[in-house]
Amino acid sequence: MLGVIQYSILTIFWLPIAAAXLYGAGLAIYRLFLSPLAKFPGPKLAALTRKYESYYEAYQNYEYYWKIKELHKQYGELFTPLTASFXRXGPIVRVNPHELHIDDKDFYYKLNSFQGAWNKDPYTAHQFANPGSIVGTIDHDIHRKRRAAIMPFFSKQKIYALESVIQGMVDKLCYRIEEYGKTGQPVNLRNASKCFAADVVGEYCFAESGGLXDKPDFAIEEMNQQQQGLKAGLRARYLPSWWMPVVRGAPAWIRASIDPAAKHFEVWHRVSDSLFVRLYDARKXGPVGRMEKRKNDEFYEKAGHRTIFHELINSPHLPPEEKGTGRIIQEAGAMVGAGGESTSQVITAFVYCLLANPQVLSRLREELRSVIPNADSPAPTLRQLEALPYLVGPLLXSTYKYVGYLLTLVARLRTGKIARHQRVPRDRPLYFNEWEIPAGVSXHEDNIPMASTDTAQTICSMTPIFLQIDPEVYPNPHAFMPERWLNLDEXQRQRLEHNLVPYSKGTRGCAGLTLANAELYMLIPALVTRFDLELFDSDAWDTEMAVDSHHHSPRPDSKGVKVFVKKSTF
């Protein structure tokens, strides 16, 4: 009897271990030899497990994107036994069990097309635990519906109507910079511009900016927390899908003890919860779609402009489930986070390049005199600034209708998303050279398991920065050369524009590009005409890409671009 009991105990102990070992062995065999992706070149360890990728992300300072570039070179030619010849396979490499990465500038527009259904990689989508937001939406059809509700707010006419709000934020930031400069301490442009961009987005979203630009040291603690929050999200993509929702639902002290970066999420939760209690209370005061008649939302009444989320929660075009508090909070958080980070990168890099190249700054100032005769002149209108060729020369035949020569150059080399643009071709296979890339599956985002079977998805990705530093298109690509964009015929300009994709393209392209451009065109002329700025303890490495923290980030020890502020000689 005792022997039977001991045997049963041993069976209970060893059976799960044996089952796990068999499952692991079977999964390894499938991924290496039987998977539809097994035929594609790439390291076997990457095909076997995502731990290969996570090693470079977690332990090599988020530098998997450069490792991928090395893999393309390593697998540039492969011997094909059937034909006894070498085939050029470098442009396509398997970088994890589910994903193929392609390095070919002509394929980018096939992968980022408006045609067909494109799901998002579930591993990337769940990293910030905001499946209700546009950026966290996996399913193509749901994403299209949510994006369609947001896009009208970023039309050129809507941005022109917001011009006075942006100008008010520009004036406030310049006042803060002037006051800070009087202390004799250098201003951190990265933090200051991030406060400005976040305040603009907050004001447009819900008539409450948050007042980051008013805080001492330009909210340096909040800015550091936000950066750490982005990195925490990147780490989360390698954890089970249930991890982030559980952590976000836990008490604040537990979140902070698990990851100090969770403090950033906690701050945002408190602000957004309070905000949406106010919004939904206001919603009860009047009929759907008639926000202007509600009298108990004093922030909206005082704002004097339409706001995105007041309109969204009362939109007759969205079903009730799309207007729930939880989803709208997630949408707001994603929008503020994305709008502040990316715009501040462009502003910081642009101002640094101007200060490091006095001849370019001098030429820009000379052009600005046509609309700003002196430092005390009234601010020009956005339309006036958009007409300046050196600052904002319209690019022909481009969706970037108002991306200027200088801004374009900065955006291409030093800003935008450094992370891979990942797409799941849901309804059809893709074809690249002689390769057939199998389609993914159609599945609702709520029931796609993160540890799904390998047939559940085929992720196809490209890294935009590889296109933007292609020396065949841009000789000496890291040099600050505005003249490369001047005096071009249409064919030459189109060739340069083809690789210019800092904000992505297609159905998943940046929704807020028009707002971001308006912020840039209005703030940068103000900075270079109202002040004489002098670099302090800063160099090019403080703006160059070094770390993939979703957006590009400079080296980890960078303190940002700092400047001394002096009275303008403009």
Swiss-Prot record:
It is a single-pass membrane protein. Belongs to the cytochrome P450 family. The chain crosses the membrane at residues 9-29. The lineage of its organism: Eukaryota, Fungi, Dikarya, Ascomycota, Pezizomycotina. Its cofactor is heme. Keywords: Glycoprotein, Iron, Membrane, Metal-binding, Monooxygenase, Oxidoreductase, Transmembrane, Transmembrane helix. Pathway: Secondary metabolite biosynthesis. Its EC number is 1.-.-.-. SUPFAM superfamilies: Cytochrome P450. Its main location: membrane. Glycans are attached at N191. Pfam families: p450 (PF00067). This is Grayanic acid biosynthesis cluster cytochrome P450 monooxygenase. It is found in: Membrane. Heme binds at C510. Non-reducing polyketide synthase; part of the gene cluster that mediates the biosynthesis of orcinol depsidone grayanic acid (GRA), the only major secondary metabolite known in C.grayi. The first step consists in the ring and depside synthesis by PKS16 leading to 4-O-demethylsphaerophorin, involving different orcinol-like rings, one with acetyl CoA and the other with octanoyl CoA as the starter. Further depsidone formation by the GRA cluster-specific cytochrome P450 leads to 4-O-demethylgrayanic acid. One of its GO terms (molecular function) is monooxygenase activity. One of its GO terms (cellular component) is membrane. The keyword Secreted does not apply.
